Amino acid sequence: MNALEITQKLISYPTITPKECGIFEYIKSLFPSFEVLECEKNGVKNLFLYRVFNPPKEHAEKKHAKEKVKPLHFCFAGHIDVVPAGNHWQSDPFKPTIKEGFLYGRGAQDMKGGVGAFLSASLKCNPKTPFMLSILLTSDEEGPGVFGTNLMLEKLKEKDLLPNMVIVAEPTCEKILGDSIKIGRRGSINGKLVLKGVQGHVAYPKKCQNPIDTLASILPLISGINLDDGDEYFDPSKLVITNLHAGLGANNVTPGSVEIVFNARHSLKTTKESLKEYLEKVLKDLSYTLELEPSSSPFITASHSKLISVLKENILKTCHTTPLLNTKGGTSDARFFSAYGIEVVEFGVINDRIHAIDERVSLKELELLEKVFLGVLEGLSKK
């Protein structure tokens, strides 16, 4: 089967987070020679398929210790869950439709197209040297993600099955297939700052202490401020205010406090501690409370790594373009792999219609992406 045929089948399952809808049974049926590991918690299902090709023999000096030499373990990872389709589609979002060179359906780009491409490439994998190939899929990436990839990786660590390298087939490209590889992601810190004042009647300002006035004086130092200068792969870390709230709704009462909710997307140069230190300097001598809660950590895979080199080589060969290495965008499951010291990158189709009405992927993209992924498998298994 090719990438198009598999992707069509995947789209036909209405796997809105965290529903799995039997899609894993279909995927397992494609790989009868692979070992299967599954885990389920709180309605979230995860699937891990793996196979060791040409298992290496024990080194003579290690025979007594019964230690086997481990082959390179490469993993394709992704999610089969999708966001709700909404209304006003030109066709049924869960009935894959081909029109004018595009495949339409919810998840076509995010990310059943990428999954279909790597499943098809994996079916064609036939290395001549010792090589371990695995596939990790979850039904909860678009949701909280607590019991998805993160949980499965805990199980894999327990069983000594963690991969060495991973490609997460998220839709990373902007205009043409091959123009972008995500080699890392920024971290995310959620914050809440409450500036305290003294509530009172607006007619007696000397008896009040309006925290909004206080906020106005420090706002230029916190709203949209760059926390560092970034680097070659990371944009400058930035603090962005997402919500402000003050007052009782009455026009003759000054508020007793003002609440500022914010988020900081940050590089490796900024941490929770450095952000706290900066805000404490800005807020010196003011009455306030501050809460900071990291929701994800920044990470990056070295641009000279074997995985990135092989991927770039096959993108150039297949797509005739040199990809930009970057860390733009929101968080993804790639961060969970990085936490275990695993080389991980993200590469997939164009992302111009993710989560949108009439989501679609071009048939040519699926064909080329499968070739890139197969080339990566061949390249890694030879090295």
Curated annotation (Swiss-Prot):
Active site (record annotation): 81, 141
Enzyme class per UniProt: hydrolase
Pathways per UniProt: Amino-acid biosynthesis; L-lysine biosynthesis via DAP pathway; LL-2,6-diaminopimelate from (S)-tetrahydrodipicolinate (succinylase route): step 3/3
Positions that bind Zn(2+) 2: 110, 142, 355
Pfam family, one: Peptidase_M20
Coiled-coil residues: none
SUPFAM superfamilies assigned: Bacterial exopeptidase dimerisation domain (SSF55031), Zn-dependent exopeptidases (SSF53187)
Cofactor: how and how many bound: Binds 2 Zn(2+) or Co(2+) ions per subunit.
Reaction(s) the record says it catalyses: N-succinyl-(2S,6S)-2,6-diaminopimelate + H2O = (2S,6S)-2,6-diaminopimelate + succinate
GO MF entries: acetylornithine deacetylase activity; metal ion binding; succinyl-diaminopimelate desuccinylase activity
Annotated Zn(2+) 1 binding sites: 79, 110, 170
Necessary cofactors: Zn(2+); Co(2+)
Swiss-Prot/TrEMBL GO biological process terms: diaminopimelate biosynthetic process; L-arginine biosynthetic process; lysine biosynthetic process via diaminopimelate
Keywords: Amino-acid biosynthesis, Cobalt, Diaminopimelate biosynthesis, Hydrolase, Lysine biosynthesis, Metal-binding, Zinc
EC number in record: 3.5.1.18
Family: Belongs to the peptidase M20A family. DapE subfamily.
Role this protein plays: Catalyzes the hydrolysis of N-succinyl-L,L-diaminopimelic acid (SDAP), forming succinate and LL-2,6-diaminopimelate (DAP), an intermediate involved in the bacterial biosynthesis of lysine and meso-diaminopimelic acid, an essential component of bacterial cell walls.
Subunit field text: Homodimer.
Entry protein name: Succinyl-diaminopimelate desuccinylase
Gene name in the database record: dapE
